[in-house]
Amino acid sequence: MNPLIRAARPEDVPTLNAIYGHYVEGCTCTWEEADARLFSREGLARREERYPVLVAEIGGEIRGWGSLSPYNLRSGWRFVAENSVFIDHRFHGKGLGKALLAALLDRARSGGVRKVIARISGDQLASLGLHRAMGYREVGRLREAGFKSGKWLDCVYMERDLGTAQP
């Protein structure tokens, strides 16, 4: 499958939130437990260009999204971003996550980001595998740091060194 990767638009917000909402309700890939509206039209419009939200379209329908966010708001962290990728559960295994993550890494490079961080629940083997395949390496693990769905979860920290930013 060759998805169209493009910047998210305000009218995409309901679909982005619906995709995310599926995982809030039934998955440990996000540790959010309550009904969450990750995006708003206003918030999406105000995002810095350096921290995009991208969507993957197939046949004109959004089937996944990915974003870059500041890893930490303190100024010394300005060269580090965190990525998130969520795929419509009906479209797993079709290369959408890889396409979105590749596009996010390209945008990070062009935006002066030096490292991209991913925080992944230790039981999410597909996500861990995707990030490894895209050149990320595990740099830390917080054991039993989160609790969801009746169980304690590890948080795996992975990084991709882009080595491009200069202060």
Region annotations inferred by a language model:
Residues 67-70, 117-120, 132, 137-154, ...:
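Conserved catalytic-core motifs of GNAT/GCN5-like acyltransferases
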Residues 3, 61-65, 153:
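Glycine-rich phosphate/pyrophosphate-binding loop shared by adenosine-nucleotide-utilizing enzymes
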Residues 92, 118-128:
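Conserved beta-strand-loop-alpha-helix junction that forms the acyl-donor binding cleft
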Residues 108-120:
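Conserved GNAT acetyl-CoA-binding A-motif
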Residues 93-106, 129-133:
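Conserved acetyl-CoA-binding loop-helix of GNAT-fold acetyltransferases
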Residues 4-18:
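A short beta-loop-alpha structural element at the N-terminal edge
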Residues 17-35:
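Helix-loop element at the rim of GNAT/NAT acetyltransferase active sites that forms part
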Residues 29, 33-90, 101-102, 107, ...:
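Acetyl-CoA-dependent GNAT
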